Amino acid sequence: MATARRVARVAELIKREVSQILLSEIKDDRVGAGMVSIVDVEVSNDLQNARIFVSIYGDEAAQQQTMEGLASATPFVRREIGQRLGLRRVPTVVFLQDRSLERGSRVLALLNQLRQPAEAQQQEGSHPGVEGRMADTPGGEEDELSEQQ
C-alpha cells in the first residue's frame, strides 16, 4: 500500500501526463470531436487502478464520439504513462465522463427560474404605503400618549 501522499502525487502526475498525451500524442480524430479536459484523476491505494474523469464540451454526439475515441486510446495512454512515469506497475486506466459541470449549470438555471418569480412577487407585493406607515408609527404613538395625559 502506498501512502496517501504518494497516491496524490501519482494522481497529479498522471493528470499532467495524460493532458499532454491528449493534447499532442493521440491522433484519433474522435478524441478531437469535442474539447476534452481532464477534471480529476483518482488512483487506488495500491496504485493498480486510475480513474480519469474528463469533461467534454460539445453536443451529445460529439461527447459520445470522444468517449469512444478515448476508450480505443486507453492502451496507448497506459503504455505512455508507464514510459513517462517509470512506475513498477502501471495502473489500469479507465476514462469516465464527468458531468458535474452540466449538473451544476442545470441547478443554477433552476435556481434562476425560481428567483425570477420570487423577485416579481416581491415587486408586486411591496406597497409604498406600508413603508410610509412604518415611518409614521413613532409619531402616532406619541400622539396617542399625549391624548391620554
From Swiss-Prot:
Q: Name one GO biological process term.
A: maturation of SSU-rRNA
Establish whether keyword DNA-binding is in the entry: no
Give the source's domain of life in one word. Bacteria
Give the UniProt keywords, A-Z.
Cytoplasm, Ribosome biogenesis
Q: Which GO terms describe its molecular function?
A: ribosomal small subunit binding
Q: Which GO terms describe its cellular component?
A: cytosol
Locations of Acidic residues compositional bias? 139-149
Q: Where is this region: Disordered?
A: 117-149
Q: Where in the cell is it found?
A: Cytoplasm
UniProt keyword Transmembrane helix present: no
Q: Which InterPro entries match?
A: KH_dom-like_a/b, RbfA, RbfA_dom_sf, Ribosome-bd_factorA_CS
**Pfam families the UniProt entry points to:** RBFA (PF02033)
Reported function = One of several proteins that assist in the late maturation steps of the functional core of the 30S ribosomal subunit. Associates with free 30S ribosomal subunits (but not with 30S subunits that are part of 70S ribosomes or polysomes). Required for efficient processing of 16S rRNA. May interact with the 5'-terminal helix region of 16S rRNA.
Q: Which family does it belong to?
A: Belongs to the RbfA family.
| Complex formation | Monomer. Binds 30S ribosomal subunits, but not 50S ribosomal subunits or 70S ribosomes.
Protein's recorded name: Ribosome-binding factor A
Q: Which gene encodes it?
A: rbfA
